[in-house]
Amino acid sequence: MRNEISTLHRETGVAWDATAKLYEDSEKSDIAFLRDGGNNLMEPEQRILSDLETWCNCAIHLQCAGGKDTLSLLTQGAKEVIGIDISQRMIASAKRRSNSLQANASWYCCDVLDVPKSLDAIGDLLYTGRGALPWIMDIQKWAAIVRRLLKPKGRLFVFEGHPLDWIWDTNTSDIRFHVERNNYFTEKIVGGERWPFPFLARQEDPELVNLRMHERQWTLGQIFEALLNVGFNLIHFDEYPIPYWDQFPNIPKEILTRLPHTYSILAERN
């Protein structure tokens, strides 16, 4: 099973390498945004994390992509940030951003389930979310890794897309079950078709037609169980009617906001 999971993660990493150009193209604008004190974290994230300067010497960001959110943690007050991602091109893009800003940041390219032991127990904060968890094929191992990276009393913060959004049709103008993906409790692995990045990459380069990405849904219950099993104490949980990306472009806001589209978890390592 572990070898199978590694293969799925590796194939997804290759696909993210191929789609990284979309992040590379925004490097200059991201650098200017961050240099001017910009913060890419959403309002609930900024409010819950508050001023990191008072308690966070080191923030670790799992599945950091191009690093814009990672570097925003410095704007939020963290003294040092560490970004981890499976895509080499994403990490290279993140490094270019931080080097231009002379930011106190370091970057590691690896599967998040194989993070080096040298990072054990150094994080005051572990930050993740906004499309990160569905790419993880073993949520129990993920929770154990999160605990490993945090200091005692270190905090995990997750701001993620709500699992209910998996079951809705993204092409309709009202809330309607997806024809195939309509079971909240499904454990089926799917091919990343919910995301625009692979589609846009294939449009630019038809040779990428065989890109393979693998994601699956984790229910809120599965996520909480994984964290409780490794000894986290829950501090905060909330749900929000705001999506973190334009997943339902045809649904009017007054209808869309009747359902949760994101959630946040703040938990402390024992």
Question: What positions do the PLM features span?
Answer:
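N-terminal, positively charged/glycine-rich alpha-helical extensions of SAM-dependent methyltransferases
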Residues: 1-30
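Conserved alpha-helix/loop element of class I SAM-dependent methyltransferases that forms part
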Residues: 29-57
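Class I SAM-dependent methyltransferase SAM/SAH-binding core
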Residues: 58-115
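A short acidic, Gly/Pro-enriched loop at the edge of an enzyme's catalytic core
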Residues: 117-126
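A short glycine-rich, Lys/Arg-flanked "PGG" loop and its adjoining helix->strand segment in the class I
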Residues: 140-155
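Conserved class I S-adenosyl-L-methionine
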Residues: 155-200
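Short alpha-helix
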Residues: 214-238
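Core SAM-dependent methyltransferase catalytic element
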Residues: 230-232, 250-270
